[in-house]
């Protein structure tokens, strides 16, 4: 069907595995929420984005106060029942709050060992899932009505693409439905292209197009065929340029465009450029725990182990200050610190920080067992077999997440001897 010989299934699997990382980055980019810049009321955007109420709600969001942001966005939606973008902001906040609870907001998982090939099962409460689906459908329906009434409504096209993009991110990260999500991502791009045709200065619309341009250019033809986007073109540098334009001139997508830009530069190992973008975000929002964590992650990725260790420790130090961060998921910082110390051959320190990650009260079972497995490996390298066995037993215990069980059982039989 695809012109591949029967004995080439193994190379094909390798191609798909390599490209899963790129797909994961596509949806990771859809996760960065919007924050309106200070702009002039004549900006090419829905007027609601320039109101103090929306700005205040985003302030709470960017301090990772999801409950405070949700309360405010719900009030905005109630006061503006015909605003699709207001509905989209409620959708965004619900999705982010849930992904935070699931430890799915550390982009290291998207840029490296892809969650798409993991065995992890993510459980979402039915009421939460139902509300996310309802909000998505409501936002799209509102846009459909507005486009029918006015085919030149750029705001409606943009808001529809925004809702589709958010939903695509959700079903990818939670359900691993990346084929369906890729099609939604393409629909989001189409909506953005239409918004730009109507208003060439609608800078926010360039973000979805830029993401698709880069991601599609990174995929070989076989994978495009498999996910049904064979007619879509892509160009990496054009995609990056579009993201830069949205970051510079967008009202709604300036922050998420920078986040996407940083992720894609990271994907292509352009670490100094990625770190420069991410450091700008961390400086602009020093109380955003995720931006600070990502700055440390990128420092690690560019090969500056000592610098990354110092960056992770600064995050932990700030987290000890009263009210500096809101509900920081410190397990992600401890895990990143341990990984970096492991790479620097600081084995005892790595073991301790894997244990710290596992001990965090809000750590998901999935991340806890990953930390326990890694702690066991460190104890084996330290020739502390009894401690290693204890960690492997916890990582392979019945019930809960089983994604680390096979490796843990293997090391129960034979001590880990790698690095």
Feature locations, PLM:
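Short coil/linker segments at helix-helix boundaries
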Residues: 38-56, 60-73, 82, 93-152, ...
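Bacterial N-terminal signal peptides
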Residues: 21-34
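TPR/TPR-like (Sel1-like) alpha-helical repeat modules
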Residues: 189, 193, 231-235, 240, ...
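Alpha-helical adaptor scaffolds
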Residues: 254-266, 299-306, 313-367
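Amphipathic alpha-helical segments of tetratricopeptide repeats
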Residues: 78, 190, 197, 247-248, ...
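Boundary/linker segments of alpha-helical solenoid repeat arrays
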Residues: 82-86, 155, 203-204, 252-256, ...
């Amino acid at each position: 069907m695809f012109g591949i010989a029967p004995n080439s299934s193994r190379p094909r699997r390798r191609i798909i595995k390599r490209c899963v990382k790129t797909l994961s980055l596509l949806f990771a980019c859809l996760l960065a929420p919007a924050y309106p810049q200070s702009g002039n009321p004549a900006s090419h955007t829905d007027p609601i984005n320039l109101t103090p109420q929306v700005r205040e709600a985003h302030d709470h969001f960017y301090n990772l106060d999801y409950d405070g942001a949700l309360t405010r966005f719900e009030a905005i939606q109630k006061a503006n029942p015909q605003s699709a973008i207001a509905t989209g902001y409620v959708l965004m906040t619900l999705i982010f709050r849930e992904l935070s609870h699931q430890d799915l907001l550390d982009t290291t998982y998207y840029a490296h060992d892809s969650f798409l090939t993991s065995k992890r099962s993510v459980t979402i409460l039915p009421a939460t899932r139902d509300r996310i689906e309802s909000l998505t459908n409501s936002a799209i329906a509102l846009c459909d009505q507005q486009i029918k009434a006015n085919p030149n409504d750029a705001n409606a096209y943009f808001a529809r693409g925004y809702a589709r993009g958010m939903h695509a991110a959700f079903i990818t990260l939670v359900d691993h439905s990346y084929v369906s999500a890729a099609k939604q991502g393409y629909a989001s791009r189409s909506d953005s292209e239409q918004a730009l045709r109507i208003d060439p200065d609608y800078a926010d619309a360039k973000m979805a197009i830029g993401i698709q341009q880069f991601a599609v250019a990174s995929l070989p033809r076989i994978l495009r065929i498999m996910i049904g986007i064979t007619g879509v073109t892509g160009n990496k540098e054009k995609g990056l340029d579009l993201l830069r334009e949205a970051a510079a001139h967008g009202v709604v997508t300036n922050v998420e465009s920078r986040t996407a830009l940083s992720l894609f530069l990271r994907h292509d190992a352009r670490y100094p450029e990625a770190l420069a973008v991410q450091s700008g975000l961390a400086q602009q929002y020093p109380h955003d725990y995720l931006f600070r964590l990502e700055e440390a992650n990128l420092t690690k990725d560019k090969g500056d182990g000592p610098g990354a260790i110092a960056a992770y420790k600064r995050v932990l130090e700030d987290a000890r200050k009263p009210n500096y961060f809101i509900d920081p998921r410190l397990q992600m910082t401890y895990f990143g610190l341990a990984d970096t110390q492991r790479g620097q051959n600081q084995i005892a320190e790595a073991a301790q920080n894997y244990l710290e990650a596992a001990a965090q009260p809000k750590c998901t079972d999935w991340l806890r067992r990953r930390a326990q497995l890694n702690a066991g490996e460190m104890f084996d390298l330290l020739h502390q077999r009894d401690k290693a066995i204890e960690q492997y037993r916890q990582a392979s215990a019945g019930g809960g997440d089983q994604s680390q069980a096979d490796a843990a059982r293997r090391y129960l039989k034979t001590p880990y001897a790698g690095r």
